[in-house]
Amino acid sequence: VFVQCVGSRCDGVEKGKPYCSKICCMYTAKHAMLCREKYPDTDVYVFYIDVRTPGKNFDEFYRRAVEQYGVHYIKGMVGKVTPENGKLKVQASDLLDNRQLHIDADMVVLAAAIEPDKSARPLATMLTASMDTNDFFTEAHPKLRPVESPTAGVFLSGMCQGPKDIPETVAQASAAAAKVIGLLCKDSLTCNPCVAQP
């Protein structure tokens, strides 16, 4: 049993995060297919709120998990997981069929919320870089300067800016590296001098 959105997309929940972790749907589909490949007699269930497949061919990948691999996607919430006789008893609700489910599982896999590292806030203070309300670094402009922070000379890539998959992170890192090379190739740099106050 795979459980999606554990601790993410939880507005108003004390310990939850309001944002989508963005990569969980595809990684869960991949691991569900790998599980069915390795153990073909296994029933694999995925409980989800919404399946988000925003990238190229991602929707086809998700449909392949359902149609070719026989992964059971159930729109609903897991209410309780209880260990019993060497198994995990999963109590859940199927929102589309309006029924309660009880599944005996060997394993329950949680797709937990992605959180920024705790050291991000002190680093932002040291670099005078800005952060959003979720403690991710913010870019200077989302369309025009997506890898630059508002602080000159500070560039962003990867999950420091928000949840991203590997290809998006690599593309962003390449863009940040190009910006750094452009900065270092200049004959001279102009910067604002910092003066210590007595």
Task: Describe every region a protein language model picked out.
Residues 1-198:
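Residues forming the flavin
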